[in-house]
């Protein structure tokens, strides 16, 4: 069936529609509103986004905070040049972390970040990840100090389709105004559309709940299996506070800000008796595993053959999704992380 064929999720996007910078002010970004019942499409801007939110809906937001996850070092202690790039993915345990390292590397290699801080390669994993340990003055660093090291020397992990180096504006624009808990290596991009003013209006006028899904590097990996149902999606760390769990359990109508919030809600609502706050979320939503508990979604325009495009298709239908994306291309909407948005009602 074509809805499970990977090639069905391909489309051509003119390169000039890939957004390399955000629209400022945020309210000026374009918004495509699609009402499924009437099939009506409205073209507007984020200045009016809250006007379209159903009044009784619970709005769910992901308050993860992006780490400056790209850090450069040298394989030599005297630091002639920092040309070795380490991309931090997530903590493993204690002072160790799963990373990607560009270039040739072997177990035992050291990467020096300055005269005091370095990392040592412990293991080369089959999936391309490298397990490394962080040290300060030859003493194992705790996780809080590793985050401080990344904050001091790291760079914002812009997605690979943004073809430029990170700049000072990315430190705040590639971060939502409600980002709180450090741990993501990619931004939950629908959240980037909210200015402080729009957020305050949302919190005042709508029921809302926060959760934390630390977006992983796997979010940029395309689906590679010909039959999308065979794809194994990445696992991400999810935390839902008890207060938010209680609100979610009571709510009949849910609007998610972004696919990360939607995946989190769907994962949580399918658990029989959740009795903890921390989870490992690995839910892959598509037409054979449809959305059951979320009614509305605010999202960006996603990459061809991506699991996120399949999620949107699970909500809208494959043919309608392709039709809407074609309209967005014709109307010169900007795509991907710094691009425009789509509200599905």
Curated annotation (Swiss-Prot):
Isomerase found in the keyword field: no
Reactions accelerated catalytically: 7-aminomethyl-7-carbaguanosine(34) in tRNA + S-adenosyl-L-methionine = epoxyqueuosine(34) in tRNA + adenine + L-methionine + 2 H(+)
Subcellular location, record wording: Cytoplasm
Gene Ontology annotations for the cellular component aspect, listed alphabetically: cytoplasm
Enzyme Commission number(s) from the entry: 2.4.99.17
Function: Transfers and isomerizes the ribose moiety from AdoMet to the 7-aminomethyl group of 7-deazaguanine (preQ1-tRNA) to give epoxyqueuosine (oQ-tRNA).
Entry similarity comment: Belongs to the QueA family.
Name of the protein: S-adenosylmethionine:tRNA ribosyltransferase-isomerase
Originating species: Helicobacter pylori (strain Shi470)
């Amino acid at each position: 069936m074509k809805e499970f064929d990977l090639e069905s999720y391909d489309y051509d996007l003119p390169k000039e529609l890939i957004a390399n910078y955000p629209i400022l002010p945020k309210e000026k970004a374009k918004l495509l509103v699609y009402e499924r019942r009437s099939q009506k499409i409205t073209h507007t801007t984020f200045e009016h986004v809250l006007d379209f939110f159903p009044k009784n809906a619970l709005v769910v937001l992901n308050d993860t905070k992006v780490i400056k996850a790209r850090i450069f070092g040298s394989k030599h202690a005297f630091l002639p040049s920092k040309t070795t790039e380490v991309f931090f993915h997530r903590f493993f345990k204690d002072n160790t972390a799963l990373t990607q390292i560009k270039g040739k590397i072997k177990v035992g290699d050291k990467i020096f970040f300055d005269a005091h801080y370095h990392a040592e390669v412990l293991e080369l994993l089959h999936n391309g990840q490298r397990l490394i340990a962080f040290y300060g003055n030859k003493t194992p660093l705790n996780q809080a100090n590793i985050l401080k090291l990344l904050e001091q020397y790291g760079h914002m992990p812009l997605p690979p389709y943004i073809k430029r180096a990170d700049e000072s504006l990315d430190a705040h624009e590639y971060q939502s105004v409600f980002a709180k808990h450090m741990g993501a290596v990619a931004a939950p991009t629908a959240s980037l559309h909210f200015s402080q003013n729009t957020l305050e209006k949302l919190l005042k006028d709508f029921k809302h709940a926060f959760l934390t899904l630390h977006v992983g590097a796997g979010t940029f990996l395309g689906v590679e299996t010909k039959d999308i149902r065979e794809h194994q999606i990445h696992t991400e760390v999810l935390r839902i506070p008890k207060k938010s769990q209680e609100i979610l359990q009571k709510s009949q109508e849910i609007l998610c800000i972004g696919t990360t919030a939607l995946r989190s809600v769907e994962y949580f609502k399918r658990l029989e008796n959740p009795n903890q706050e921390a989870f490992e979320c690995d839910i892959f939503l598509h037409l054979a595993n449809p959305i059951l508990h979320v009614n509305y979604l605010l999202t960006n325009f996603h990459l061809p053959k991506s699991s996120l495009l399949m999620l949107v298709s699970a909500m809208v239908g494959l043919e309608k999704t392709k039709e809407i994306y074609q309209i967005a291309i014709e109307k010169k909407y900007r795509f991907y992380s710094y691009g425009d948005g789509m509200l599905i009602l």
